[in-house]
């Protein structure tokens, strides 16, 4: 996908789960490599779905080394000069309240914006953390429309 996009002067963003850093593969030469490391080498942008409902929990998923991983997502992105976009969940979900900002946003309109500002401040040492993706933002929009 990346080669095709490059040939057409298009950009590609790889949207991946936060636990991708835990996985390795063996290449044709028999060398074991990290999947996320490879993706950040060939891509200009990755979106890491860091679905948690607090700044500290999101920060742990992207800036700390996960169990079973050798490096953090930020370590790979920084080493390979790849932008790391942090994906935040905004929809009501059956996966549990801890994976989405839906409930917090209903209780305190604008909460997700304050969390983004907190993450930006806390992780300011990383040059490639400046972008965020709010997944299922339409849920928040519909909620705001109904309360007006």
What name fits each language-model region?
Residues 1-32, 79-93, 133-137:
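Aromatic-lined carbohydrate-recognition surfaces of secreted/lumenal glycan-active proteins
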Residues 3-4, 66-67, 71, 108:
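Proteins with a high burden of low-complexity, intrinsically disordered sequence enriched in S/T/G/P/A and R
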Residues 15, 60-61, 140:
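Aromatic-residue detector
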Residues 22-39, 58-76, 117:
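Alpha-helical scaffolding within the catalytic cores
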Residues 41-46:
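Glycine-enriched alpha-helix->loop->beta-strand junction motifs that scaffold or abut catalytic
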Residues 47-57, 71-148:
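Substrate-binding cleft of secreted/luminal carbohydrate-active enzymes
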């Amino acid at each position: 996908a990346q080669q095709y996009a490059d040939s057409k002067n298009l950009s590609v963003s790889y949207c991946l789960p936060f636990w991708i850093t835990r996985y390795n593969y063996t290449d044709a030469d028999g060398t074991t490599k990290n999947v996320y490391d490879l993706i950040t080498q060939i891509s200009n942008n990755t979106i890491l779905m860091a679905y948690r409902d607090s700044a500290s929990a999101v920060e742990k998923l992207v800036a700390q080394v996960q169990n079973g991983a050798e490096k953090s997502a930020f370590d790979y992105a920084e080493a390979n000069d790849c932008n790391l976009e942090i994906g935040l969940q905004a929809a009501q979900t059956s996966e549990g309240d801890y994976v989405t900002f839906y409930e917090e946003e209903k209780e305190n309109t604008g909460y997700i914006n304050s969390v983004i500002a907190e993450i930006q401040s806390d992780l300011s040492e990383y040059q490639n953390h400046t972008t965020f993706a709010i997944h299922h933002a339409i849920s928040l929009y519909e909620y705001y429309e109904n309360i007006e």
